[in-house]
Design a protein with these regions (language model features):
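Conserved catalytic core of nucleotide-sugar-dependent glycosyltransferases
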Residues: 73, 94-223
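Glycine-rich phosphate-binding loop at the start of an alpha helix
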Residues: 66, 70, 95, 236
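N-proximal low-complexity "stem/linker" segments adjacent to membrane-targeting elements
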Residues: 1-63, 67
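Short beta-strand-to-loop acidic/aromatic patch adjacent to the donor-nucleotide binding site
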Residues: 80-92
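Short, Asp-centered acidic motifs that coordinate Mg2+ and/or phosphate
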Residues: 83, 112-114, 249
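Active-site nucleotide-sugar/metal-binding loop of Leloir-type enzymes
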Residues: 70-83
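C-terminal catalytic/acceptor-binding lobe
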Residues: 2-22, 194-300
Length: 300
């Protein structure tokens, strides 16, 4: 990725107010993370303050995420909203980052029909942590290593950026991205359905989706093995089929999302002793530890 100079952005509120956002969250078991809730409350407040229409839709107790996403789309298409915004219940974001995404989409709706934010997988790439730690750039703030410790949920578009370099302060084209934070224009689903009539089906879980008996909906999201023998998750399958329609998938590298989850903490005193590592917090390290966790930051 290449860097460019940052600049202040004047939101195009007139264009943004013409949008109607349908924020949908599949929420298995009716559960979400506190950080998701905080982000949602901040976002709702911002949207109301700026006069941008937004409604919320939650789908509880659907264990199959593919079916849940298709139900969300079906209910979105019944509404008058212009854009479906998928945000998963384990994602945390800054409200102003979402406002900026909305601004970009509103500025050029025809171009940015699919816009996504990138978030890390629920894993720690220890080799990346080791490489970053050896660089010496984190000696004064070791907790910042968590910012470079993961693999992101997307695949780059190598044809668009053959040299492997892309700007990070403007939207970039990607091959595939996760649906956990994705804004999609209504027309994308309309073109998708027209191109794939074979994906129409009758939903069987009528209670969860508020469907009438015999009603037909589309499987926009499903897991498949494609013609290159790749196993595609439902979000990557969606991206692949959308790109075949000539619609680009755009991502915003500069916004920061958190992917909430659980982690198993391990510790072995014998190994600590062998490496000369303190079993408890060392006194000389206390002053070096500075909290850099986003949920402790004030909204900018």
């Amino acid at each position: 990725m290449t860097q460019t100079e940052t600049k202040n952005i004047q939101l195009n509120l007139e264009a943004m107010r013409k949008m109607h956002i349908y924020l949908a969250t599949p929420m298995y078991g009716g559960q979400c993370y506190g950080l998701y809730t905080k982000s949602l409350m901040d976002t709702t407040s911002q949207m109301m303050n700026y006069g941008i229409p937004m409604e919320l839709y939650y789908l509880f107790n659907e264990s199959l995420v593919t079916r849940a996403r298709n139900y969300c789309v079906a209910n979105f298409l019944k509404s008058s909203a212009t854009h479906l915004l998928f945000i998963d219940s384990d994602i945390s974001w800054k409200a102003m980052d979402l406002m900026y995404m909305t601004h970009l989409v509103a500025e050029d709706t025809d171009k940015y029909r699919v816009m996504t934010g990138l978030y890390p997988k629920k894993t720690i790439a220890w080799e990346k942590v080791l490489r970053a730690a050896k660089s010496g750039n984190y000696d004064e703030n070791p907790m910042a290593l968590e910012k470079v410790a993961g693999d992101m949920v997307f695949n780059p578009d190598h044809k668009e950026y053959p040299e492997g370099r892309a700007p990070i302060f403007e939207p970039v084209k990607v091959r595939e991205a996760g649906t956990g934070f994705m804004m999609i224009h209504r027309s994308v689903f309309e073109e998708y359905a027209e191109a794939h009539p074979e994906l129409e089906y009758t939903p069987d879980h009528l209670r969860e989706g508020d469907f009438k008996t015999g009603e037909k909906i589309h499987a926009y999201f499903d897991c498949i093995i494609n013609d290159q023998n790749r196993y595609l998750s439902e979000d990557y399958m969606f991206c692949e089929n959308v790109r075949k329609l000539g619609i680009d998938i755009w991502a915003l590298p500069m916004i920061e999302l958190m992917h909430c989850g659980s982690y198993i903490y391990q510790g072995k005193l014998i190994d600590m002793a062998a490496q000369g590592v303190h079993a408890t917090m060392a006194a000389d390290d206390i002053g070096k530890i500075r909290s850099s966790r986003p949920y402790e930051d004030n909204e900018k």
